[in-house]
Amino acid sequence: MDAAPMIHGTTVWPSPAKLNLFLYITGRRANGYHDLQTLFQFLDHGDELTITANNSGNITLSPALADVALEDNLIYKAAMALKNAAQSPLGADIQLHKVLPMGGGIGGGSSNAATTLVALNYLWQTGLSDDQLAEIGLALGADVPVFTRGFAAFAEGVGEELSAVEPEEKWYLVVRPAVSIATKDIFTHPQLMRNTPKRDLASLLTTPYENDCEKIVRSLYPEVDKQLSWLLQYAPSRLTGTGSCVFAEFSSRKDAQAVFAQLSDNVLAFVAQGRNVSPLRKTLADYQSAKIRPY
């Protein structure tokens, strides 16, 4: 029996952060899920996955994440989900270089899962479509499909109805207050506003951007409130997702860096530019065209 085809060698893949430039909660369904309207944009900053496909049939991941069992790790779950969906006999060694915080609202875990799906679909030559990868991703998390598709998007429904958009690619100063916030804790909070009127995209893009989770997060987490109040002195600033990260927007890298330089040394923060095409999609295209090659 012939060995399954695969791309040999070691490959390196970006796992970019995202921002919710706005986030509105327009209702709550009987199953507890929320109807949203949100605008996703990627950043040119994130984690990195080094992946080598092999014939072992096993998925190895290093380093192990503290307090997260391998079977619960989204990277492992994504690899196994693709393996099962494509009925692939292949395996992979995956190394994660982690810089994005967990519980930060910038998509760290969802982005890792999406990068795993996109990379292994290529390396294992499984040939699944973008729609199929998005469907697998949705079972892993509501934000995974936007990362697998790789385009800035306006999302509706529970976040799965995506329309490609091209917001301005501004510069952002992203600050991580010293607290991790579980999405579930915010979406189940009794004081969360859930009745924002649904609007069309044109209206949303021409009104000041807001985040319906921001008020409750600021009241529950003084660290977030303090950091956001500080940023608002310098530029339009908001919470992303359910936090804990907050961001300020600027028209130039120079302006963002100037405010970054004023932060205390013990504050976790970075400056990045918005990207309407994900660095992941660009890397995939570069591998497919042999612009970059495995080593």
From Swiss-Prot:
The protein's Enzyme Commission number: 2.7.1.148
Catalytic reaction list: 4-CDP-2-C-methyl-D-erythritol + ATP = 4-CDP-2-C-methyl-D-erythritol 2-phosphate + ADP + H(+)
Enzyme class: transferase
Superkingdom of origin organism: Bacteria
Pfam families reported for this sequence: GHMP_kinases_C (PF08544), GHMP_kinases_N (PF00288)
Alphabetically ordered keywords of this record: ATP-binding, Isoprene biosynthesis, Kinase, Nucleotide-binding, Transferase
Pathway: Isoprenoid biosynthesis; isopentenyl diphosphate biosynthesis via DXP pathway; isopentenyl diphosphate from 1-deoxy-D-xylulose 5-phosphate: step 3/6
GO molecular function: 4-(cytidine 5'-diphospho)-2-C-methyl-D-erythritol kinase activity; ATP binding
Gene Ontology BP annotations: isopentenyl diphosphate biosynthetic process, methylerythritol 4-phosphate pathway; terpenoid biosynthetic process
Residues bound to ATP: P101, M102, G103, G104, G105, I106, G107, G108, G109, S110, S111
Keyword flag Cytoplasm: no
InterPro entries (alphabetical): GHMP_kinase_C_dom, GHMP_kinase_C_sf, GHMP_kinase_N_dom, IspE, Ribosomal_Su5_D2-typ_SF, Ribsml_uS5_D2-typ_fold_subgr
Segments forming a coiled coil: none
Active site: K18, D143
SUPFAM superfamilies reported in the protein's UniProt record: GHMP Kinase, C-terminal domain (SSF55060), Ribosomal protein S5 domain 2-like (SSF54211)
PANTHER family: 4-DIPHOSPHOCYTIDYL-2-C-METHYL-D-ERYTHRITOL KINASE, CHLOROPLASTIC
Annotated function: Catalyzes the phosphorylation of the position 2 hydroxy group of 4-diphosphocytidyl-2C-methyl-D-erythritol.
Family: Belongs to the GHMP kinase family. IspE subfamily.
Name this protein carries in UniProt: 4-diphosphocytidyl-2-C-methyl-D-erythritol kinase
Organism: Vibrio cholerae serotype O1 (strain ATCC 39315 / El Tor Inaba N16961)
